[in-house]
């Protein structure tokens, strides 16, 4: 895994082959409290439905607790939403984007 002050990443391996990856960024909110943003959670197609994604996610959540975050946010595509709901995430708010 890679750990820096505001970034934590983890790699899942199977016999030296990368089969999953997760990363979370941390930042301090202006009004107080730290927040985590899950940037990536990827599992190779052939290794899905084996619990690897759940293990990666639990690891990211654990690190967010160590970092004393009060919440974790992420953006998800439609096929992944059920996975995140199953893991205890709630739908909330609207995300607006401005691409540069």
Predicted region positions:
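Conserved hydrophobic beta-strand within the GNAT/NAT acetyltransferase core sheet
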Residues: 38-41, 71-74
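Conserved beta-strand in the GNAT
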Residues: 11, 17-26, 42
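Active-site rim helix/loop that mediates acceptor-substrate recognition in acyltransferases
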Residues: 1-9
